């Protein structure tokens, strides 16, 4: 990636972590359709590999704004995709895709982080990976820890995530009939791939 700063990438990861961690409330629903978010999406589209994914997300948001009971419908989508059994869902856990659920715990320890008691999900939840990536990108921007160490940990985290994120995104596309979370997962998939290639 060339046009986005490490802080901006950190913000994108933090934003995605928030959206994948819990159902959207009314305030978040208003925010994603705001002029401020439109500016943010324009900035993201300045990064060519992200353009199509951001356009897809904007289209799903535009459709969302005219949907009756949008928040309730989106909550039902969230529940159906991320909280049910894996038969017709896209469970947001590394272990659901036959990955080592202990890997994220090792990465968190290496980064000097731990999961919050406020987040009542297993440590291998997608949002934890994204929070870790956000933290690492912010750390790169601060310059207080050697960049080589942070970058090595960032690469390990991206490698672990790339093991199961494509299947997760495919399941979102397959089972999210409305398409908001499918579009969100596609943006995440492209972002992670771009970030990984940036080595």
UniProtKB/Swiss-Prot annotation:
UniProt keywords (A-Z) are: Chaperone, Cytoplasm
Q: Which InterPro entries match?
A: Chaperone_TorD (IPR023069), DMSO/NO3_reduct_chaperone (IPR020945), HscB_C_sf (IPR036386), TorD-like_sf (IPR036411), TorD/DmsD_chaperones (IPR050289)
Its localization reads: Cytoplasm
The entry's cellular-component GO terms read: cytoplasm
- The main place the protein resides is cytoplasm
The record's NCBIfam families line, in alphabetical order, gives: PRK04976.1
Q: HAMAP family in the record, alphabetically?
A: TorD
What function does this protein fulfil?
Answer: Involved in the biogenesis of TorA. Acts on TorA before the insertion of the molybdenum cofactor and, as a result, probably favors a conformation of the apoenzyme that is competent for acquiring the cofactor.
User: Protein name, please?
Assistant: Chaperone protein TorD
The scientific name of the source species is Escherichia coli O45:K1 (strain S88 / ExPEC)
Q: What is the lineage of its organism?
A: Bacteria, Pseudomonadati, Pseudomonadota, Gammaproteobacteria, Enterobacterales
């Amino acid at each position: 990636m060339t046009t986005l700063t490490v802080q901006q990438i950190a913000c994108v990861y933090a934003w995605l972590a928030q959206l994948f961690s819990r159902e959207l409330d009314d305030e978040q629903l208003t925010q994603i359709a705001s002029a401020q978010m439109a500016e943010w999406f324009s900035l993201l589209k300045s990064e060519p590999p992200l353009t199509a994914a951001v356009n897809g997300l904007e289209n799903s948001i535009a459709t969302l704004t005219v949907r009756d009971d949008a928040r309730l419908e989106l909550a039902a989508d969230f529940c159906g995709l991320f909280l049910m059994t894996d038969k017709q869902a896209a469970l947001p856990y590394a272990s659901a895709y036959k990955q080592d659920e202990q890997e994220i715990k090792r990465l968190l320890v290496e980064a000097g982080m731990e999961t919050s008691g406020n987040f009542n999900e297993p440590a291998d939840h997608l949002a934890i990976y994204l929070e870790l990536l956000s933290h690492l990108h912010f750390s790169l921007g601060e310059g207080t820890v050697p960049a080589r160490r942070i970058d090595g940990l960032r690469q390990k985290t991206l490698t672990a995530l790339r093991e199961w994120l494509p299947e997760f995104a495919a399941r979102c596309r397959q089972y999210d009939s409305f398409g908001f979370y499918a579009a969100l997962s596609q943006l995440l998939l492209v972002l992670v791939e771009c970030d990984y290639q940036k080595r």
